[in-house]
Amino acid sequence: MLYEEAKWIGAELLKISKPGIRMLNIGSSSHEFRANSQPYINEFIFRPLTENNITVLHTDIVDEKGVDIVGDLTDEIFIEKLKQEKYEVIICSNLLEHMINRGPIISAIKEILATNGFALITVPYNYPYHLDPIDTMFRPTINEIHKKFHEFKLKKGEIVIGKSFRKNKFQKNYWQQINQNPKLILKLLLRCLVPFYKPKVWFYTIISMKNIFKPFSATCILVKK
């Protein structure tokens, strides 16, 4: 998650929140990731919510510390379990680009979200190819991601320019991420010369290199059911 993206998410969630509501953060990752690897996630999003008596439950397919509900959002039984809890807000941040089949996850969000509830969705807009464990290079515009939730009303949409955070340093673009690693630069340049080996990965690498000096950004939308 980008630094400014976390600020945007936190600010929008506070605007629509009131004490007593329940939020579900899907694809949440661990407490270690939210509090230490990218500490601004906790600082700008979850700490203010906690201070305002907002309940946030974190769900992920991986059982780690900080994951409240472990389960697979493509599993109908698991979805039915979540639907019974009546979540007024669902957060889905930087998950959809890692799904080969996004349909079941999007359908799950629509099913689980309470009537008149809000879904806050973010995905990268300009960010290089990164495996976690895969990256489909899904980099939609505001309209493209809203079309996935066309039954919902778009309350706000923005392309948020921001900085990434890796190895305790901020980076504004891909060049700043790789310029201290000559071996990686050489590897990327050589990869660009071999289009016939794993052509899809080659294409994604070309896109990443093409945008090497462009600022990182994320597509962020808030929709209402």
Stretches with model-predicted labels:
Residues 17, 50, 213-214:
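Short, flexible hinge/linker loops that cap or flank conserved catalytic cores
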Residues 1-4, 26, 201-205:
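Helical cap/lid subdomain of alpha/beta-hydrolase-fold lipid enzymes
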Residues 12-14, 49, 149:
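Hydrophobic, Leu/Ile/Phe/Ala-enriched alpha-helical segments that form helix-helix packing faces
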Residues 1-20:
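Class I SAM-dependent methyltransferase Rossmann-like catalytic core
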Residues 8-12, 26, 212-214:
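Extended interaction regions within the primary functional domain
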